[in-house]
Amino acid sequence: SQNMGYALLSLNKKVVIKDNQTRAVTVSMIQILTSEHDLIVDDSVSFEAEHLVSGSDEVVCHLIRGSESHVIDSQHILSEDKLDRQTGTTTRVLSIVSEHGTFKRNDLIKLVTSVELTACEATNISIKTPTRYTHFSLEIHDQPTAVKAPSRLTHKWDAIRNGFYQFGQEQTKLTTREDNGVMQFEHSLLFPKQFTKHLYSWEFNTPD
């Protein structure tokens, strides 16, 4: 059974702890997958996510079909952790079984999870996706930890083969690599001094 294509998200953190103080920030990650096939006959889809830091093990999956969206029952989600003994990295493989027979073209599967980062200054984001997906966007929502209403700063990242990442007024070249038909996007993101909540949203769309 072929998969619907996957996105591999790896979060590599550089930890800086000053004055023996530990501070944490929660990063919520959303991955959206669309079909890489014209016709879907599969009844399941799987993806891999590396959890390099301990955090919430809960993964909430949504199936979006047209204007409808609903949470996929956890009994339809199979999880397996694979440990790389050399690096100590655990890769979680999730398999999602359709509740409605088969997945259809342009179905979106949104997966939400979160991890705790301790005194994090820099995070490298690495994503792998089949080259058929030519549109790639990253949105960052800054939510100050203060009780006041959070600011909604949204930054979008669009890439076709090569592109640029824009954060505020700064623009950084987006690095891409191709390996066995899989395009990999890379960018290092520097967290602000204050610890805020960031929401990362990836969208993978098949070309028209």
Describe each region flagged by the PLM:
Residues 1-208:
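Lumenal/extracellular ectodomains and adaptor appendage modules
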